[in-house]
């Protein structure tokens, strides 16, 4: 199958935030300048994925009470494919007469009690979040739900954002962490828009 364009949730996010930056990167091949990228969120992300994989298919202890009746999808090899943007979720959509390849990589995937699927994403913040961050992540989660649907994995209509933030620091240098789980409603239709 051939396609006219290849997009991902992050590329679409750039389009929404800065159309000129999107044009420069994708048409003129001039990348948007990146500031210093913090390594702490990437480190937390890696630790959390390792933790989830150690429990798979059971949820890690901190989520069992918050998400009763749910499990983690797949085995370690299967989820690692979904975590890689080259082998993750892929679909082709027809938009205004053009074929668009949509690709995305998930942090994890929750299997709901009814057998439907919910994207799960780990986020980090400097303090406990006051809101779910939907203004930043809603469209990304809608696109993941659309990609699940197009890959014959029925989306549940929910996505989970698990925010991790520092809570304490001890005199011997140990840092305590807390987490706050949010549920976003998702829509395949919004993902198409």
Residue ranges and their predicted role:
Residues 1-116:
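Metal-dependent nuclease catalytic cores that hydrolyze phosphodiester bonds in DNA/RNA
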Residues 5-7, 149-193:
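Metal-dependent nuclease catalytic regions and adjoining charged, substrate-binding loops involved
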Residues 27-33, 122-124, 174-178:
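Short acidic (Asp/Glu) and glycine-rich catalytic loops that position anionic groups and cofactors
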Residues 29, 125-127, 165-168:
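Short, solvent-exposed loop/turn segments at secondary-structure junctions
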Residues 107-109, 115-122, 157-163:
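Conserved active-site beta-strand-loop modules that form the wall/rim of enzyme catalytic pockets
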Residues 122-132:
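Short beta-strand-loop-alpha-helix junction that forms the active-site gateway
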Residues 137-149:
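An active-site-proximal "capping" alpha-helix that borders the catalytic cofactor pocket
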């Amino acid at each position: 199958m051939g396609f006219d364009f290849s997009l991902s949730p992050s590329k679409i996010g750039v389009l929404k935030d800065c159309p000129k930056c999107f044009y420069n990167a994708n048409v003129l091949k001039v990348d948007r300048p990146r500031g210093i990228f913090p390594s702490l969120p990437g480190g937390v992300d890696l630790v959390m994925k390792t933790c989830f994989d150690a429990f798979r298919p059971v949820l890690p202890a901190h989520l069992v009470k918050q998400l009763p009746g749910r499990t983690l999808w797949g085995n370690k090899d299967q989820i690692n494919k979904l975590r890689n943007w080259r082998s993750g979720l892929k679909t082709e959509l027809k938009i205004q007469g053009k074929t668009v390849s949509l690709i995305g990589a998930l942090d994890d995937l929750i299997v709901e009690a009814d057998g439907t699927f919910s994207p799960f994403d780990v986020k980090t913040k400097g303090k406990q979040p006051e809101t779910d961050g939907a203004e930043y992540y809603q469209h990304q989660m809608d696109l993941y739900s659309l990609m699940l649907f197009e890959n014959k994995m029925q989306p549940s209509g929910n996505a989970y954002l698990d925010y991790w933030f520092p809570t304490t620091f001890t005199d011997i240098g140990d840092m305590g962490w807390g987490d706050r789980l949010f549920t976003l409603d998702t829509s395949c239709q919004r993902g198409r828009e």
